[in-house]
Structure formats: structure tokens, C-alpha cells
Amino acid sequence: MSPQTETKASVGFKAGVKDYKLTYYTPEYETKDTDILAAFRVTPQPGVPPEEAG
């Protein structure tokens, strides 16, 4: 019989959903010559804020 080990939930990552607004904009990002600009038209479903639909 193998020994049991204790697993801690706080190790690795914290479960949950972050507000999208907190993760999609990075003001300190500097563009590179290899960056590609792409544009898409997205229509949010009813009840979804436009900034989260993209």
C-alpha cells in the first residue's frame, strides 16, 4: 500500500474566475516588429458586456 500524501489547494493556482477587465489590457506592453494586428467584429450575446464579448 502506498503512503498517502496531503494535497493543498493553495499550491499551484487559485481556483475562481477573474474579472475579464483585469486581464485583457497590459499598458506596459511594447510592440515588436513581429507583432501582427488582427481585427474581428464580435456581437455579444444578450446580457454580456461588449468588452467581455471579444
From Swiss-Prot:
Keywords, comma-separated and alphabetical: Acetylation, Calvin cycle, Carbon dioxide fixation, Chloroplast, Lyase, Methylation, Monooxygenase, Oxidoreductase, Photorespiration, Photosynthesis, Plastid
Propeptide section residues: 1-2
UniProt key word Plastid: yes
Cellular location(s): Plastid, Chloroplast
Catalytic activity, EC: 4.1.1.39
Gene Ontology CC: chloroplast
Lineage top rank: taxon: Eukaryota
Biological process terms in GO annotation: photorespiration; reductive pentose-phosphate cycle
Modified residues (N6,N6,N6-trimethyllysine): 14
Keyword Chloroplast: yes
InterPro entries xrefs: RuBisCO (IPR033966), RuBisCO_lsu_fd_N (IPR017443), RuBisCO_lsu_N_sf (IPR036422)
Reactions catalysed according to its record: 2 (2R)-3-phosphoglycerate + 2 H(+) = D-ribulose 1,5-bisphosphate + CO2 + H2O; D-ribulose 1,5-bisphosphate + O2 = 2-phosphoglycolate + (2R)-3-phosphoglycerate + 2 H(+)
GO molecular function: monooxygenase activity; ribulose-bisphosphate carboxylase activity
Modified residues (N-acetylproline): 3
Protein family: Belongs to the RuBisCO large chain family. Type I subfamily.
Subunit structure: Heterohexadecamer of 8 large chains and 8 small chains.
PANTHER family: RIBULOSE BISPHOSPHATE CARBOXYLASE, RIBULOSE BISPHOSPHATE CARBOXYLASE LARGE CHAIN
Additional information: The basic functional RuBisCO is composed of a large chain homodimer in a 'head-to-tail' conformation. In form I RuBisCO this homodimer is arranged in a barrel-like tetramer with the small subunits forming a tetrameric 'cap' on each end of the 'barrel'.
Function text: RuBisCO catalyzes two reactions: the carboxylation of D-ribulose 1,5-bisphosphate, the primary event in carbon dioxide fixation, as well as the oxidative fragmentation of the pentose substrate in the photorespiration process. Both reactions occur simultaneously and in competition at the same active site.
Name of the molecule in the record: Ribulose bisphosphate carboxylase large chain
Gene designation: rbcL
